[in-house]
Amino acid sequence: MRIQMRLSRPTVVAIQEYKQIKFADPKAKVTNGYLVGMAYKAIQNDLDRIDWKAINKDISNVTINYDDNSISDLQTALNLEKTVLDGIEKLQIKFMDVFDTKRMFRPFVIKLILFAAILKETDNLTLLKEENNNE
């Protein structure tokens, strides 16, 4: 499905960083939609255990190039699989509770998905503590 949106500068940097991590080539010929789909699938099994507030607070520490002023926001159309888009929509609803807000925009959800995937790839993903510890 094709979705039109404006991605923020940190999201654009995250896309570049994730591409570098996955393909070791920042000029790899893959679409932004494909990378968002890869990121979503990489964290899909952990969605309910991820500490989204911690990821949101750590955004500036996730990428090396965050302060690169040559990178600006991006108006783009993402081609996403239906399952990925459905997952993003479910996260939008979940994030309204997590961040105690009445409205949640897709670009913000996509940004957090990318940052969570980058943190997972670098073994720095913060998961919520298990509520039922069997000790």
Regions found by a protein language model. Give the residues of each.
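Compact DNA/chromatin-associated regulatory and scaffold domains in nuclear/nucleoid proteins
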Residues: 79-82, 86, 93-94, 107-116, ...
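N-terminal interaction modules that seed assembly of large macromolecular complexes
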Residues: 1-47
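Conserved aromatic-histidine-acidic binding/catalytic patches
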Residues: 3, 28, 76, 98-102
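Short, recurring structural edge motifs at helix starts
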Residues: 23, 95-99
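Structural motif corresponding to the C-terminal cap of alpha-helices
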Residues: 92-96, 121
